[in-house]
């Protein structure tokens, strides 16, 4: 049984504040996350540069998938930094781990989280990235609360959504 489905959590929402909760992208769609056009479509290099991440900080990529953003951030923060890759799908984390090993990166910690909790250590993160994943949160209040607990005093959250999933 996957950790995300731990039955101790609150019931999942189908909508939140009038917004339909999108279905989580299945791990079998992972190749799409690495598509060649992604840089052109999303201007990822520009976005990462604008984050102004510094060597030695700790970052968390919520909904990391197979690590498209995680690996970029891990490279910037360097070996003295700590990157947390947080995902509810262990299959995605396995792919991320393989990519990190291939790239020789050892500063990435994988976290298989639950739907309602990022499962990050408290007051441990300088920067949190949620790239194109918030619309999939079935427990938005609980997730944001757990992310807030993980932030250091001056921690920053970046919420990035590329398109409207809900027709409303």
Where are these regions (language model features)?
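A short acidic, Gly/Pro-enriched loop at the edge of an enzyme's catalytic core
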Residues: 118-128
């Amino acid at each position: 049984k996957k950790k995300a489905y731990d039955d101790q959590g609150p019931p999942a929402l189908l909508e939140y504040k009038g917004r339909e909760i999108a279905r989580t992208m299945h791990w079998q769609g992972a190749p799409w996350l690495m598509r060649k056009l992604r840089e052109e479509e999303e201007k990822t290099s520009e976005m990462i540069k604008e984050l102004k991440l510094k060597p030695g900080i700790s970052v968390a990529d919520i909904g990391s998938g197979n690590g498209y953003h995680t690996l970029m951030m891990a490279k910037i923060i360097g070996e003295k930094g700590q990157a947390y890759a947080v995902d509810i799908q262990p299959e995605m984390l396995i792919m991320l781990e393989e990519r990190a090993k291939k790239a020789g990166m050892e500063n990435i910690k994988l976290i298989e989280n639950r739907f309602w909790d990022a499962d990050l250590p408290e007051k441990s993160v300088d920067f949190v990235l949620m790239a194109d994943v918030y619309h999939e949160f079935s427990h938005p209040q609980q997730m944001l609360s757990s992310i807030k607990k993980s932030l250091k005093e001056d921690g920053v959250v970046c919420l990035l959504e590329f398109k409207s999933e809900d027709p409303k």
